[in-house]
């Protein structure tokens, strides 16, 4: 996140909960049945728990930093979503404060201690010369919290961002040090490549969009808070779904528009520089 923050939107510029619900309904009819709510921090939005609790049954998960003081953890536990993904890039207070710009590690740890969900994942973006020395700490930390840790290569979109740290070398070191098994596997067509721990029952995941891209297996599309549709996080093209939703009352017309746009999703690398940062895209 840039120190100055990101561009702020007027309330009218972002999708309402009713519009999001409409998108979920229409995309289900197109065969899309797995949804993840991310950010930024989705739990900051006023009324979001009421929205989550009113959703029809389905395969939902949330990505959150769990960094909000006074966060209603009991309400999170009652959601019974398919998974809860937690973002945390350092377990050291000073580094945590730096990477979050203002976060307090003790708040995160206090919130995490109260989480009671069946499928808990901790996502760690590995940043060169920043948190590479915390890999084993995160593996141990995840085990203590009955979670699966997933290491993610930093996606370097904009000029001036820190270089990513290749997970290929990190995996090699973990295998050589007897921490993970060399054989890899995938779970439910996930883009994550998992290795089981040699000691213990857990798994360690690796998401490698740079060194070993998975474009041919990716079925994700992203809908930003302002209603822009991204078919690929690396691509520069955005499609304005918000205006279609607000100008077209017929769900079938919106469904056809979505169907036609989704056909343009790339299944090979289209990495471009000087695009939006992940802080702007979300996720």
What function would you assign to each model-found segment?
Residues 94-113, 118-205, 209:
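Radical SAM enzyme [4Fe-4S]-AdoMet core and its adjacent flexible, acidic
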Residues 7-22, 42-83, 87-107, 124-137:
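Canonical radical SAM enzyme core domain
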Residues 1-15, 30, 232-233:
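Canonical Radical SAM [4Fe-4S] cluster-binding loop centered on the CxxxCxxC motif
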Residues 157-173, 179-270:
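Accessory C-terminal segments flanking Radical SAM cores
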Residues 20-31, 114:
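A short, N-terminal amphipathic alpha-helix
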Residues 27, 55, 76-79, 112-115, ...:
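Generic structural signal for hydrophobic
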Residues 34, 41, 261-283:
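Short flanking/linker segments adjacent to small metal-binding domains or redox-active Cys/His motifs
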Residues 34-36, 59-63, 83-85, 119-121, ...:
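Structural preference for beta-strand elements that scaffold enzyme active sites
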């Amino acid at each position: 996140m840039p120190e100055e923050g990101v561009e702020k939107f007027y309330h009218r510029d972002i999708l309402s909960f009713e519009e999001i619900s409409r998108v979920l309904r229409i995309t289900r009819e197109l065969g899309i049945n797995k949804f993840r709510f991310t950010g930024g921090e989705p739990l900051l939005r006023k009324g979001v728990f009421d929205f989550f609790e009113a959703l029809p049954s389905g395969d939902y998960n949330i990505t959150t930093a769990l960094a909000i003081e006074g966060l209603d953890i009991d309400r999170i536990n009652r959601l019974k979503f398919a998974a809860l993904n937690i973002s945390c890039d350092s377990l050291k207070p000073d580094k945590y404060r730096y990477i979050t710009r203002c976060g307090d590690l003790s708040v995160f740890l206090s919130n995490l201690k109260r989480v009671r969900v069946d499928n808990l994942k901790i996502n760690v973006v590995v940043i060169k010369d920043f948190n590479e020395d915390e890999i084993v700490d995160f593996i141990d930390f995840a085990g203590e919290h009955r979670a699966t840790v997933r290491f993610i290569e930093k996606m370097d979109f904009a000029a001036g961002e820190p270089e990513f740290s290749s997970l290929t070398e990190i995996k090699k070191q973990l295998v050589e040090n007897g921490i993970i098994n060399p054989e890899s596997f995938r779970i439910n067509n996930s883009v994550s490549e998992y290795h089981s721990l040699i000691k213990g029952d857990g798994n360690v995941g690796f998401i490698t969009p740079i060194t070993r891209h998975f474009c041919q297996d990716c079925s994700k599309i992203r809908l930003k808070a302002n209603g822009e549709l991204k078919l690929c996080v690396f691509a520069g093209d955005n499609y304005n779904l918000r205006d279609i939703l607000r100008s077209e009352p017929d769900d079938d017309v919106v469904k056809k528009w979505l169907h036609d746009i989704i056909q343009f999703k790339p299944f090979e690398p289209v990495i471009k520089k000087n695009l939006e940062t992940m802080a702007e895209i979300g996720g």
